[in-house]
């Protein structure tokens, strides 16, 4: 009688845990410059290879190589990108300390991922709408939104533009093309596709761009967004940031073990690319390509950005419990700030002295902005928006039952 082996459930495991170094060979990598650049109007069938390779521009020596090395990227744009990334990292570090001092309740930094939001922010045009997750504060910093305004939202103080209605880091700035961040995963993909469809229906020229993490690709809204984007050829860029971890869950749990996240788009008939998210030049080049496709009615593009979440998921997380403490230092794609710095220095457009001076200038700017924000209140001082604001900004004409409740509160 034939012996049938018992069934076994496969549960993916990371190659590294505390005390055991991560083997990053699980990441399919390509050499800088070796991945081809297709024509804008080619379809997903002709480009399936791009969902499994890795678009890279900067080599180990900091030189821009290959077909994605865009000569139209001006040195001034690269300098701006480096400055925004430095400013973001300093802002993040300061807000992390503020949370530890109990001045704010919660914070999420973008350490190690700064190039992705910054590069695409500088590739988009005014009027385009971004649907970010909670690690794209550099979209706003790249647009020179006052740091004190961001801090007031974090402090939930009397000058909080959202009047305390959102969790810290869940910004909303319509005038900056920054849609309200939601704590529910993958919702922004559906929202971005719907907004892009509306833009097309109106005959507008504005496109949408959305960001989610690798873990959120397991949510049903991800598949819904892909279906609508493909069927209606929505003018949208769909960004998946594969930073290896969804809180304490390794990216393989979301489906990254046997295929890539970019490959998810192929099944929906969407042109899908996989790119180095720590290579600022690759981010700008790939973003411009996808944005141009969307703006020219060539449909959506799904981009998987390979990066690494260098810090904790949030201030409520302790990554030392589930991964090696030195993981980021051994991540093969490096630090996005150091890589762009190396490239600019190689070109003669940056120096160690300017780098040091820039850091000092932004440190002083962040401290000044923090003092201004704290003058309007923090969790320690208790200065918050008036209770009356809970009745505002919902109805054009307040219904009777809310008017009665407001009267009962005496506000």
Question: What residues fall within each predicted segment?
Answer:
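Short, ordered loop/turn segments at secondary-structure junctions
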Residues: 135, 241-244, 277-278, 306-308
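Glycine-rich, charged/polar anion/phosphate-binding loops
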Residues: 222-225, 285-292
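Short gly/pro/ser/thr-enriched loop/turn and capping motifs at secondary-structure boundaries
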Residues: 138, 244-247, 263, 309-311
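Conserved thiamine diphosphate
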Residues: 197-204, 257-289, 332-359
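Short beta-alpha connecting loops at secondary-structure transitions
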Residues: 245-251, 270-276, 320-329, 353-355
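Cofactor-binding active-site loop characterized by glycine-rich and histidine/acidic residues
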Residues: 90, 97-234, 239, 250-257, ...
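Conserved acidic/glycine
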Residues: 1-116, 311, 317-320, 325-411
